[in-house]
Amino acid sequence: MKPLTKIWMDGKFVDWADANIHILTHGLHYGYSIFEGMRCFPTPAGPAVFRLQEHLERFLNSAKIYRMNLGFSAKELSEACLELVRKNGKKDCYLRPIAYTAYGEMGLNPLKNKIAVAIASWEWGPYLGQDAQTRGVRATVSSWVRIDPRAMPVQAKCSANYANSALAKMEALSAGYDEAIMLNSHGVVAEGPGENIFRVKDRILSTPPASSGILRGITRDTIIQFARDMKIKFYRNDSTKEELYTSDELFFSGTAVGIAKIREVDGRRIGYDGFPITDKLHKLYTAVVHGKVNRYSKWLTPVTA
């Protein structure tokens, strides 16, 4: 990772090299932290953060679920994000707000510990590589099952949840694949380790419902709105592993990955007739995040003061 200039910590901007925490930080030991991920893109009117308010709303909702009093409002966090981009001077960057139980009492009860809040930014290219945007990725159905919502609140973007994702990711990479696809405890498709998943069959677009134990992704919501506006037939429904194999098109979506085609699942080729619907959605998404479609300009928050 290439260091930038500043990181925001508990209301103050500190130098990148000084953004440190104690080794006995409670959240480091018990996974008691929440985070968000959002992107800033260059646009004709200057850099802008895509769907900033929706990301911060989810961040605050995650805090409520985990009984974290952040001590900062959505407005204060929004301004901190924008000022951080201005100070670091990068028009194309990734933003990572995080809140965690700070140094203090150890043990499983987090309620005695102060909640620390920080925001970092860095330059981050396509999460699954440039080929993911053009040629597509090779995926495998993981042996690791997606966390059950009865065990962990999956709508909260909690760091602890991502240990489950990391196991699936490592398994896929070790087997020579680019990414994993995770099933839930009922054996139906949930999502990728850090992405939602969409399927096209007979020109009908579908994605797993929230009841399958997925994170309600903001890029997922963006694509659903695009599909409605483009008159693409769309459903939220469960899919089996076998239905993945017989898909006409598959793609991942997420803030980090954008929209990435899946060209193969467990050795089965996907997209024999190309990816016409995926390509249309990707083209629109790219135009929207770069401020070239007025209809969706409300989703862009300008960085310029």
What is the predicted role of each segment?
Residues R86-C93, I232:
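Short secondary-structure junctions
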Residues M1-F72, E76-E83, M106-A305:
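Helix-start/capping segments and mature chain N-termini
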Residues Y100-E105:
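Short, internal active-site loops enriched in acidic
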